[in-house]
């Protein structure tokens, strides 16, 4: 039998496919063996002596069906698992996923002014310290912290208002006490004693002069 390796290689080059896709008509092997140029191969392709095989179709319907079932949790029992738990899903990957979710939530809350930069830093360090196991716990902690801060602020405002009220009451009492002391025991304002006039000296009697003896 005549070798048709050259013709198959040229046909694959002309039809731009692999050599496995080339079909040579076995009844026309004598004519095909005479073709030793690309031009002759093109003529044989045009005549139908050389054909490009159709692409085989591999159905993925079963694969899609299995994927949907696995998404529901089917076919994932102990008998279907190969590899340790760490090999199937490393704890580091779980950690990175959780950190990214929680940090993304904190960044979103900070940008929307739901938390200030101080609470952001505090919660960020708690996330790093593995305090929150999921996003729901972090959100609950943020709401609880905000409510506690609002409560502390309300109590502080009430305390300051009470202090101001007590201070005003003390000032009023002090003013009334000063006023009572100024009025005196009789209830009326005590008269201010006028300064006594200066005493005038009494007139002295004239002493008679003695006559001198001459």
Curated annotation (Swiss-Prot):
A single BP term in Gene Ontology: translation
- Residue ranges annotated as compositionally biased, kind Basic residues, are 60-83, 164-175
**Basic and acidic residues composition bias: which ranges?**
144-163
Q: Which GO terms describe its molecular function?
A: mRNA binding; structural constituent of ribosome
- Is Ribonucleoprotein set as a keyword in this record? yes
Which Pfam families would you find in this protein's record? Ribosomal_L19e, Ribosomal_L19e_C
Any one GO CC term of the record:
plasmodesma
Compositional bias per record (Low complexity), positions renumbered to this chain: 189-207
Which UniProt key words apply to this protein? Ribonucleoprotein, Ribosomal protein
Q: Does the keyword Lipid biosynthesis apply?
A: no
**Annotated region described as Disordered, given as residue ranges:** 60-85, 144-214
Question: What protein family does this chain belong to?
Answer: Belongs to the eukaryotic ribosomal protein eL19 family.
Q: What is this protein called?
A: Large ribosomal subunit protein eL19x
Query: What is the scientific name of the source organism?
Result: Arabidopsis thaliana (Mouse-ear cress)
Give the lineage. Eukaryota, Viridiplantae, Streptophyta, Embryophyta, Tracheophyta
């Amino acid at each position: 039998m005549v070798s048709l390796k050259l013709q198959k290689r040229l046909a694959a080059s002309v039809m731009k496919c692999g050599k496995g896709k080339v079909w040579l008509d076995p009844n026309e092997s004598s004519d095909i063996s005479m073709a030793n140029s690309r031009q002759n191969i093109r003529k044989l392709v045009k005549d139908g002596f050389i054909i490009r095989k159709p692409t085989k179709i591999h159905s993925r319907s079963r694969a899609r069906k299995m994927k949907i079932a696995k998404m529901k949790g089917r076919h994932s029992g102990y008998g279907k698992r190969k590899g340790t738990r760490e090999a199937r899903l490393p704890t580091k990957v779980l950690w990175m996923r959780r950190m990214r979710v929680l940090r993304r939530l904190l960044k979103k809350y900070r940008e929307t002014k739901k938390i200030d930069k101080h609470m952001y830093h505090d919660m960020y360090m708690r996330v790093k310290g593995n305090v929150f196991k999921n996003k729901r716990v972090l959100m609950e902690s943020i709401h609880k912290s905000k409510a506690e801060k609002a409560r502390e602020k309300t109590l502080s405002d009430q305390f300051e208002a009470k202090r101001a009220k007590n201070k005003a009451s003390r000032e009023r009492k002090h003013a009334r006490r000063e006023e009572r002391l100024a009025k005196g025991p009789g209830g009326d304002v005590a008269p201010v004693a006028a300064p006594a006039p200066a005493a005038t000296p009494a007139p002295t009697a004239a002493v008679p002069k003695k006559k001198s003896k001459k």
